[in-house]
Amino acid sequence: MISKLLKIVLLTAGVIGNTLADSRIHEQYLVKAFPNEPVDYEGRMHAGHLNQTDQLDGDLFFWMFESVKPEYEHRSILWLNGGPGCSSEDGSLMEVGPFRLDDNNTFQLNPGRWDELGNLLFVDQPLGTGYSYSLAKDFQSNNEKMANDFSIFFEKFLEEFPERANDEWFIAGESFAGQYIPHIAAKLKEKNLVNLGGLAIGNGWINPLSHYETYLNYLVEKGMVDFESELGQYLHHSWAECLLAFDKIGSGSGDLSKCESFLGDILYMVSKEPGKACMNMYDISLESTYPTCGMDWPYDLSYLTEFLSTREAMTSLNVNLEKVHDWEECNDDVALQYAREGIESSSKLIQDLVSTVPILLFYGENDFLCNYLSGEKLTRSLEWNGAVGFQNQSAQPFYLPGYSDQPSGSYVSSRNLTFARIVEASHMVPYDHPNEMKTLITAFFNNDFASLPSVPKPSPDLGNGNYKWLYLGLIPVALTIIILFSIYLCRRFGLFGLSKQRYQPISPTP
């Protein structure tokens, strides 16, 4: 009995000791006073560098938001933005993080926040991206090195935050993260570091060839180019030269100058004022000035860059101020290094991973650069789990309750792979369609796409169908009756000091 009691005491002491040790370890990363944090934010944040310069050619920066919902405290979500070389703080402060910065330098809670679905981890990577830094001026960037560096970082992260080691992990991101995510997932599986619950890639740059192949078709489908017109024929010729270049280089890696020229022709010519205005390549519903064509979008970027470059913001996030002096959204040096190395398709990795890991490919329909037609082309040719493509399976619409009688998007799901489209959404779906994105990703995290509303469901308090408009029409009638009845009571009984006798009429002065 005494030995059992002693064992319990020792175990308890060990647990308390480990908890205190974890607290001390976490203390150096705790975000204690984030500038202009919303007063109603109830979560906890950790951020900083893991001091791995002995293992890496620099140090990666992370920012983690703990789940505000206890039921999801053992689900963790890694979010990565693309580029290559673009900071994941785009995701933390403009897309899926708990709050967003407005033009008054104040933060508002984000209705599309994902920290209500699990712990959220944002990492600036590869080295040299965002708050991360590289010690080597002529640093190397390619998918193999990127994935290896990330795995080294992640091993250390789990040492510092051991409570996250047994979580179910999802990896999500967009754009060039269509390269990052499959390579990182494969490396983490190879090292058996985490339990992978799924991968979600938005408007992903997965197979370069499929994007260039579909650009002209996308413009025609959207009514922006008439294929039979002089412009359509010119672009068709430019498009053919691009595809010929791909045939010559075989794998899709190498010199893409013909394809870049094709893209340049589109941005210059598909406009009411060629050379002055152009479409926003990330959201075709928006116009831009040439030659930016969307590179200055989202427009929040100007004040986000200014805020994240302040000493106050960097100090609060435990940024190494000796190595990092400001924040920039994208590092051109990282992009150039990737361009030199060449970019191959990551579709083979996706094909291998989906055999054991659920994957969601989602696309904002207004994105030109990484458009949904390229995703459809990819999935049609992809062979996974014993079959090719979705086997003529039809896409199902999904709706947001109470928002509209029109579908918010559509999805098709089979054999561990789901393909989804979000109506009128941009390259950054969570940025401009946060509720649709949160609805979709919740179904994915829970492996329950059947929960997505497949028919219009107006808000419960408004009924459904024509009853909604009946209720809305009755509201002003009811208010009028209440007001008239109140006036009657006041005059009849002198309520609230408004009896007929209270004031005598005042005659006008002659």
Curated annotation (Swiss-Prot):
The record's active-site residues are 175, 367, 427
Residues linked to a glycan = 51, 104, 392, 416
| Reactions it catalyzes | Preferential release of a C-terminal arginine or lysine residue
Stretches that traverse the bilayer: 469-489
Enzyme class at the top of the EC tree: hydrolase
The highest taxon in the source lineage is Eukaryota
Q: Which GO terms describe its biological process?
A: proteolysis
Q: Which residues lie on this side of the membrane: Lumenal?
A: 22-468
Instruction: List the membrane topology term(s).
Output: Single-pass type I membrane protein
Carries keyword Protease?
Answer: yes
A GO molecular-function descriptor: serine-type carboxypeptidase activity
Q: Which InterPro entries match?
A: AB_hydrolase_fold, Peptidase_S10
Q: Where in the cell is it found?
A: Golgi apparatus, trans-Golgi network membrane; Vacuole membrane
Q: Please indicate the ranges of residues that lie on the Cytoplasmic side.
A: 490-510
EC number in record: 3.4.16.6
Instruction: Provide an example Pfam family for this protein.
Output: Peptidase_S10
Signal sequence interval, chain numbering: 1-21
| GO CC terms in record | fungal-type vacuole; trans-Golgi network; vacuolar membrane
Q: Which UniProt keywords apply?
A: Apoptosis, Carboxypeptidase, Glycoprotein, Golgi apparatus, Hydrolase, Membrane, Protease, Signal, Transmembrane, Transmembrane helix, Vacuole
**Which SUPFAM superfamilies does this chain map to?**
alpha/beta-Hydrolases
Q: Which family does it belong to?
A: Belongs to the peptidase S10 family.
Instruction: Give a short account of what the protein does.
Output: Protease with a carboxypeptidase B-like function involved in the C-terminal processing of the lysine and arginine residues from protein precursors. Promotes cell fusion and is involved in the programmed cell death.
Output this protein's name: Pheromone-processing carboxypeptidase kex1
Its organism's taxonomic lineage begins at: Eukaryota, Fungi, Dikarya, Ascomycota, Taphrinomycotina
Q: Which gene encodes it?
A: kex1
